Amino acid sequence: MAYRLTKKALLADLYAAFLCAKKHKVNQPYVKHFENRLMENLKEIADSLWNHTYKPEPSTCFIVERPKKREVFAAQFRDRVVHHLYYNYTHEIFERTFIADTYSCIKGRGSHYGIRRMKKHILEESHNYLFKL
């Protein structure tokens, strides 16, 4: 049976996405500005998603100097909430299709897990030939 999303469930899912989007950014002015009208903002996003009229706003461009100079295009906070909503809906579907050696942005598969897997593969393929990581 197919899952039927209701507008009320969409609003609850948007609130959960908002909590994820604001993590580690609670003191940023754009988060506080969004939070001042939280329910109105979430309802506005929910309405536009529900009616298929949602359009992302232009990104903010800035230069980061460290660790190397580069141009960064940052999404507006309301769009980040939608990104988290989309991720929450789809990540399990996609992660099931990834090979075991996919590590980027997957819970429980960080750099330490990747290093352990690499070491295991090296030892298997080198027939225990001396190699130190």
Where on the chain are the PLM-derived regions?
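Non-catalytic, polymerase-adjacent accessory regions of viral genome-replication enzymes
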Residues: 1-43
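Short, compositionally biased low-complexity segments
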Residues: 8-24, 56-60, 88-93, 123
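Short acidic (Asp/Glu) and glycine-rich catalytic loops that position anionic groups and cofactors
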Residues: 19-26, 63-65, 95-97, 129
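Conserved catalytic palm subdomain of right-hand nucleotidyl-transferase polymerases, strongest
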Residues: 27-29, 112-133
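Amphipathic alpha-helical blocks
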Residues: 35-58
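Conserved pre-motif C helix in the palm subdomain of viral-like polymerases
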Residues: 69-99
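Short, glycine/acidic-rich hinge or "gate" loops at secondary-structure transitions
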Residues: 98-107
